[in-house]
Swiss-Prot record:
Belongs to the TrpB family. GO terms for cellular component: cytoplasm. CDD domains: Trp-synth_B. Pathway: Amino-acid biosynthesis; L-tryptophan biosynthesis; L-tryptophan from chorismate: step 5/5. Pfam families: PALP. The beta subunit is responsible for the synthesis of L-tryptophan from indole and L-serine. This is Tryptophan synthase beta chain 2. Its EC number is 4.2.1.20. It catalyses: (1S,2R)-1-C-(indol-3-yl)glycerol 3-phosphate + L-serine = D-glyceraldehyde 3-phosphate + L-tryptophan + H2O. Tetramer of two alpha and two beta chains. One of its GO terms (molecular function) is tryptophan synthase activity.
Length: 391
């Protein structure tokens, strides 16, 4: 397919071009600076809890008639998800740039908690924008953000989800950029955000590669859920050059593709511009952004990071979907068989594995990125069970 622009880019209003360019220049000068890298490595190790383990799940593998399966345990990081990798990186960058205030958007609440945590660690003021609908379904994380000293601002415009929270955060940044850094939570937005977030999250694949080598394995298949795409691109990054390793991203199939209630950008979307970048996007024939649905707040976003668009069109990675129902089934299965409660986001990746496991050679090695833990989802799932919607 021919495109009018490369994936990514900087599609921003004039008022935001200055802060975006400033950030881009600062990132170029700091990303390979030894002091910055050493400080980040130290805080990831001594504060966030890296490296995270690689756990083989034999009971789960046996139950689904699968091969050898390992989980990359980002759920065991401080704050319970991969989001802290990026939040600490960006907040440390902001501090080096002399910023005193951090703003962020959040959907599932994990990026909000991670950003509030990083701000607490580094002594920065923190404001979090969150859709009113997401606040309702992610109350535990809202309580955590408040406890950590963040100001949580409810966004009541539009669909009241992640897209609308991003809009409000961008408005804030346009007014306050001299003192404020916008800590974007996924590998999307205007350049340099996708590159920056990928860099901070690539510690995941770096560790997986080393951990598998230590036990004498190389992976045949990597599976990760894809919302904006930061956990997946970080998990894939160091394996992209090795074409023997199959990469699979799993989008939110919601109530099913045919229902129209989903967030499957590659399945039914087409390239367009949203929030400053060009990538695959759910839109109607007039180019208006379509509403999305997922049981998982973290996957409920109408666009996907540009790195994934490149991987999709080149054929280096394949992208599939898991429905709400399939994700719930995977959530319960892992919890009961392994004593590990996954986030609903990560459960989409597990659902895809359950679907394809019988077709995989028994000697193959599969790694699933367990991007977060499911504590934040328990109230929502309990309510679904009470309502009889888990059938």
């Amino acid at each position: 397919m021919k495109h009018p622009y490369p994936f990514g880019g900087q599609f921003m209003p004039e008022i935001l071009m200055a802060p975006v360019q400033d950030l881009s220049n600062s990132w170029k000068s700091l990303q390979n600076h030894s002091d910055f890298k050493n400080e980040l490595d130290s805080v990831l190790k001594n504060y966030a809890g890296r490296p995270t383990p690689l756990t083989e799940i034999k009971n789960f593998a046996k139950a689904i008639h699968g091969p050898r399966i390992f989980l990359k345990r980002e759920d065991l990081l401080h704050t319970g998800a991969h989001k802290i990798n990026n939040a600490l990186g960006q907040c440390l960058l902001a501090k080096h740039l002399g910023k005193t205030r951090i703003i962020a958007e959040t959907g599932a609440g994990q990026h909000g908690v991670a950003t509030a945590t990083a701000c607490g660690c580094l002594g920065l003021e923190c404001v979090i924008y969150m859709g009113a609908k997401d606040i309702e379904r992610q109350k535990p994380n809202v309580d955590k953000m408040n406890l950590l000293g963040a100001e949580v601002i409810s966004v009541n415009q539009g669909a009241q989800t992640l897209k609308d929270a991003v809009n409000e955060a961008l408005r804030d940044w346009s007014k306050n950029y001299e003192s404020t850094h916008y800590c974007l939570g996924s590998a999307l937005g205007p350049s340099p955000y996708p590159e920056m977030v990928r860099n901070f999250q690539s510690v995941i694949s770096l560790e997986v590669k080393s951990q598998l080598q230590e036990i004498g394995f190389s992976p045949d298949l990597l599976i990760a859920c894809v919302g904006g795409g930061s956990n997946a691109i970080g998990f894939f990054h160091h394996f992209i050059p090795d074409t023997r390793v199959k990469l699979v991203g799993v989008e939110a199939g919601g109530l099913g593709i045919e229902s129209g209630h989903h967030a499957a950008r590659f399945a039914t979307g087409r390239p367009g511009v949203l929030h400053g970048f060009y990538s695959y996007l759910l839109q109607d024939n007039e180019g208006q952004v379509l509403p999305t649905h997922s049981i998982s707040a973290g996957l409920d976003y109408p666009a996907v990071g540009p790195d994934h668009a490149v991987l999709y069109e080149s054929g280096r990675a394949s992208y599939t979907v898991a429905t709400d129902k399939a994700a719930l089934e995977a959530f319960f299965l892992l919890s009961r068989l392994e004593g590990i409660i996954p986030a609903l986001e990560s459960s989409h990746a597990l659902a895809e594995l359950i679907n394809i496991a019988p077709t995989l050679p028994k000697e193959s090695v599969v790694v699933v990125n367990l991007s977060g833990r499911g504590d934040k989802d328990l109230e929502q799932i309990t309510n679904l069970i009470k309502a009889g919607n888990n059938e």
